[in-house]
Amino acid sequence: MTWAPTGPTNVELRKLIRDLKKAACEYNAPVWRDVAERLSRPRRQRAEVNVGKLDGLARRGVIQEEETVLVPGKVLGDGVITQPLRVAAWRFSRTARMKIEAAGGECLTIRELLEENPEGSYIRIIE
């Protein structure tokens, strides 16, 4: 019987999780530890959020204008988005990226958001 590592096998994802945990301690930002734990889940349990859901949350006022939406998983392109949102995620589908940018929004990787905002302020986690 051979030993297999637990957790994600994607090397880039493992590095990101390590960096998120380090930032959580260094900047006293519990949001990064929460995101690291969510990204450590098996792939089938990770978040998959459609752009239509993000648009609905923005229209209802759940997502404020100054906040960055963080999806600890993949953003999918089902639905219509009319609000210009700033979205960070591990992955984006091609159509999701096109729809967000067409609505005047911005797509970021979680690593880009971490480097830009290490304190973790004004972040809304959506699953």
Curated annotation (Swiss-Prot):
GO terms for cellular component: cytosolic large ribosomal subunit. Keywords: Ribonucleoprotein, Ribosomal protein. GO terms for biological process: translation. Pfam families: Ribosomal_L18 (PF17135). Gene3D superfamilies: 3.100.10.10. GO terms for molecular function: RNA binding; structural constituent of ribosome. It comes from the Archaea. Belongs to the eukaryotic ribosomal protein eL18 family. This is Large ribosomal subunit protein eL18. It comes from Methanopyrus kandleri (strain AV19 / DSM 6324 / JCM 9639 / NBRC 100938). The lineage of its organism: Archaea, Methanobacteriati, Methanobacteriota, Methanomada group, Methanopyri.
